[in-house]
Amino acid sequence: MTEFGLQAPFSPTGDQPSAIAQLVASIEGGNRYQTLLGATGTGKTFSIAAVIEKIGRPTLVLAHNKTLAAQLCNELREFFPNNAVEYFVSYYDYYQPEAYIPVTDTYIEKTAAINDEIDMLRHSATRSLFERRDVIVVASISCIYGLGIPAEYLKAAIPLQIGMEVNQREILRDLASVQYSRNDVEMGRGRFRVRGDVLEIGPAYEDRIIRVEFFGDEIDAIRYIDPVTGEIINSLQAVNIYPARHFVTPEERLEVACEDIAYELKQRKAELEETGKLVEAQRIDQRTRYDLEMLREVGYCNGVENYSRHLAGRQAGEPPESLIDYFPKDWLLVIDESHVTVPQIRGMYNGDQARKKVLIEHGFRLPSAADNRPLKAEEFWQKVNQCIFVSATPGNWELEISENRIVEQVIRPTGVIDPEISVRPTEGQIDDLLGEIKDRIDLHERVLITTLTKRMAEDLTEYLQEHGVKVRYLHSEINSIQRIEILQDLRQGSFDVLVGVNLLREGLDLPEVSLVAIMDADKEGFLRAERSLIQTIGRAARHIRGQAILYADNMTDSMIKAIEETDRRRGIQVAYNKLHGITPQPIVKKSSNAILSFLEVSRRLNATDLKVVEEHIDELPLEEIPNLIDKLEAQMKEASKKLEFEEAAKLRDRIKQLRDKLVGR
């Protein structure tokens, strides 16, 4: 059995060894919940990696958005180059859920664009969980949504090994039954082709091709093939071909499901007719009968997920199977930035049910559609074996449930101490701030400014520009790729000051920032709560001259607590440095690390976004262009079908640009 092998150019220092030892002891002692309360820049990810190595169990790392999930995945892949570090996030490039607006009698059909590469990464994650134990899956909150039954998925896998006697036609039938399609012209994920005694399969979980060579009815060779060059990568003794989709329904189960759906329809129709809702009764009858016809004929229909309760054989109200059910019983959960992620877990179910309730009431869906849902918070926690909450500012619930198992990590390996905090009056604050900014610019350092409103951020940005400051404004309308590029430009010195509202808190690794200015710090609320203030102040905690200025005329409870906590940590850090003779050292970190790595991932995952293609066409790797052209051509044809000719023309122009780039014009 392969074990985790942590590889890092440094060893645990400061209070990392103590934190690692305490967490390992707590988990091995059978404790269910523990918290790593780690200050910004103390190497929390490295400590967690060391714990994972020592515990040696399959681990789910949960982040609250795709950006942080990708950063964590990149870091953990560097720490564990020889282990399976997987990425599991929502595979939608675009998603408009099905909805009904009664006031205007408007029905909005579900529309979605699935990202093929993310789908492959999701399949890769579940495959790794079936085949090995040295697995870390970094996921977003989408992992609590239904994912098909693990037992059925595993049961449907097709085992192949050298020397196995099997008729080639049987394998072709099996492949078709697990959603692979035959295409003898063009290979790809979820496809297979036959050339005489050679069968080639494009697995759903990777971009290599599996070639199976037959000698009569016996498997003679199994090889991995490069999909572009056709060269043999390596030979295999055996391989499992997992289904092309996570939702696998055996034929016998499908028959029973159709009967159950028909019975529910009969009951629901009668119920609606009894209450005088004749339009709704006719609507549900017509829509469900059409779906049943499709299910019986082809085993699939649009919105099939709404029948997942029947297809999986679950009882009403039972939780759906999710990614968590693919883990073994002794799995470990790590929740990053838990003060944000834990409330997300609580909120997903309620938002989903509110939309479904309207669809059910107006005859668009059967009541069982409500069971196609994310896990409720209590269902999620029931499935958790053991958990580590990770945050610089854990929520009250995490601290309470962890009891006395709160492990503090305050010392930075670099010896850098928490920022010095000063509170200044609002009168003359802009001129005061301008002077501070100019001092930082002279030292080639960066500044973050956080305001309470979008209007103030815009006005402040304009004022600073008028005074010759190179400044950018980060607002909510900027997409994740542009956001990462702006942060990248800040680190590289393309500009010196970044102004924002609520976009400067968790997960920003910006060692060049020496000053954080918080405007209206005394305006109590979510953006100026104790945890938000500590997180924002922490953005300057990676710089040896880190400072935070709070502009306020009154001292709020949140300000007092945030300042006291920061001063407490500073005291511990200063004492440690003095005791060990440590001189704080600046963090030397290439700007191409986590942020740039994610930027590259993002471009690949979102390359079918026209704006992204246009902005980055010169930077696209040549090997990715053919695949991108295929995707854009499919979008162009779809746009033409919908009579969206302007959109189709834009896509055509982008395709021409890409083809010109490919031939070197």
Curated annotation (Swiss-Prot):
One of the protein's GO biological processes: SOS response
Record note on domains: The beta-hairpin motif is involved in DNA binding.
Protein family membership: Belongs to the UvrB family.
Subunit record text: Forms a heterotetramer with UvrA during the search for lesions. Interacts with UvrC in an incision complex.
Motif (Beta-hairpin): 91-114
GO cellular component, one term: excinuclease repair complex
Pfam families in alphabetical order: Helicase_C, ResIII, UVR, UvrB, UvrB_inter
Highest taxon of source: Bacteria
Gene3D superfamilies to which the protein is assigned, alphabetical: P-loop containing nucleotide triphosphate hydrolases, UVR domain
Domain Helicase C-terminal: 429-583
Occurrences of domain Helicase ATP-binding (ranges): 25-412
Function as written in the Swiss-Prot or TrEMBL entry: The UvrABC repair system catalyzes the recognition and processing of DNA lesions. A damage recognition complex composed of 2 UvrA and 2 UvrB subunits scans DNA for abnormalities. Upon binding of the UvrA(2)B(2) complex to a putative damaged site, the DNA wraps around one UvrB monomer. DNA wrap is dependent on ATP binding by UvrB and probably causes local melting of the DNA helix, facilitating insertion of UvrB beta-hairpin between the DNA strands. Then UvrB probes one DNA strand for the presence of a lesion.
Binding site for ATP: G38, A39, T40, G41, T42, G43, K44, T45
Name of the gene: uvrB
Name this protein carries in UniProt: UvrABC system protein B
Organism: Nostoc sp. (strain PCC 7120 / SAG 25.82 / UTEX 2576)
Residues of the UVR domain: 626-661
Sorted UniProt keywords: ATP-binding, Cytoplasm, DNA damage, DNA excision, DNA repair, Excision nuclease, Nucleotide-binding, SOS response
